[in-house]
Amino acid sequence: MRNFFKTAVAITSLVMGLVAMAVVPARALVEIDVNRGVVEPVPIAITDFLSAGGRGAEISAVIAADLKRSGLFAPIDRGAFIEKISNPDVAPRFEDWKVINAQAIVTGRVTEEPGGRLKAEFRLWDTFAGQQLVGEQFFAKPADWRRVAHIIADTIYEQFTGEKGYFDSRIVFVDESGSKENRVKRLAIMDQDGANYRALTDGRSIVLKPSFSPQRQEITYVSFEGGQPQVYLLQIETGQRELVGNNFPTMSFASRFNPVGDKIIMSLLRTDGNSNIYTMDLKTRTTARLTDTNAIDTSPSYSPDGNKVVFTSDRGGRAQIYVMNADGSNPQRISFGDGTYSEPVWSPRGDLIAFTKQSGGQFQIGIMRTDGSGERILSTGFQIEGPTWSPNGRVIMFFRQDAGAAGPKLYSIDLTGRNEQLIPTPNFASDPAWSPLLN
């Protein structure tokens, strides 16, 4: 993890350039099964981290907000705390925390190291077992304190669920400002909770449908800079842009990276008005055609292992979801419900496909298994589109515009469909794309 490393409070091991230590004497008495349809949030006490200034309390607040937004945890109001933590290295008075039904306690401190580095220590305690579950410390640049908070939240999430978290990640999206008649659309990037917003393009050209590379440093997106939609690549840190396939005679759109990051899959418009799916090797710039039908084939998305591609096609008369091999062979229709389907995207876990559906005059965000079975609608509205998966495949982000609203906003929802959350953005927002974990 660039600019970060974590060290032990007990046993030292070197893994992937990170020095990691943790004490795990026992499993938490309450474990969260994220595969269950409805989960009762776990009451957890997140104390203010001790610090000379206010940074410790700010880190605690971000941790609490992350965990609460997941729908799996219920941070207890600090006003209910009986014990005031004065030394996070010493075990809490567990009986005091049992009184307020805190299943777990998070304590910590934040200090400034020589050279200006920030040091954050935290411990997670099992209240009813009376034991420490994990203890870690992190060093970072002072400006990266929010990332430290997200990583701690990920650690707590994993301790309870047995799965990686998703808080240390970013969202690239289309920022929309101005009136409907003079709407300015620019690419922007932010943390998954809406913090650290930064514009990536200047808004002089309409942009659509960004998507992250697996390495997280590059984005593919669609721009109308030349008067018609074309696929571009953008380096996030440098701002360098590149037109993909500048010899394409017609429009290109709906682009995504393959799981390795060395190819882009996209749709190219034919002169007869139909579109087919192509791949481009980013090293050789050679293209390969995957579909060849008199239909509109679009919105391709790779399976996590790179062996399959899901896409939409109206070859059967109306837009439906199909799955084919990565070389274009053996296309099979998997959606058979009422309405039309679009924007399928494979879960990073490989078990589900998210999609947008239009049925009964409304838009819907839904999921189905990779063979088309088990279709389930998570959210319905006047206009909701653009599903994108969290890195752990447990949450979906999308954009919603209600009837009469001046513009769209971003929302997230878990796979139960019961935890829909507004994602704060400075302006209207659409077309979100979730990054892999940064850590």
From Swiss-Prot:
GO terms for cellular component: periplasmic space. It is found in: Periplasm. It comes from the Bacteria. InterPro entries: 6-blade_b-propeller_TolB-like, PD40, Tol-Pal_TolB, TolB_N. Pfam families: PD40, TolB_N. GO terms for biological process: cell division; protein import. Gene3D superfamilies: TolB, C-terminal domain (2.120.10.30), TolB, N-terminal domain (3.40.50.10070). Transmembrane segments: none annotated. HAMAP family: TolB (MF_00671). This is Tol-Pal system protein TolB. It comes from Chelativorans sp. (strain BNC1). The lineage of its organism: Bacteria, Pseudomonadati, Pseudomonadota, Alphaproteobacteria, Hyphomicrobiales. The gene is tolB.
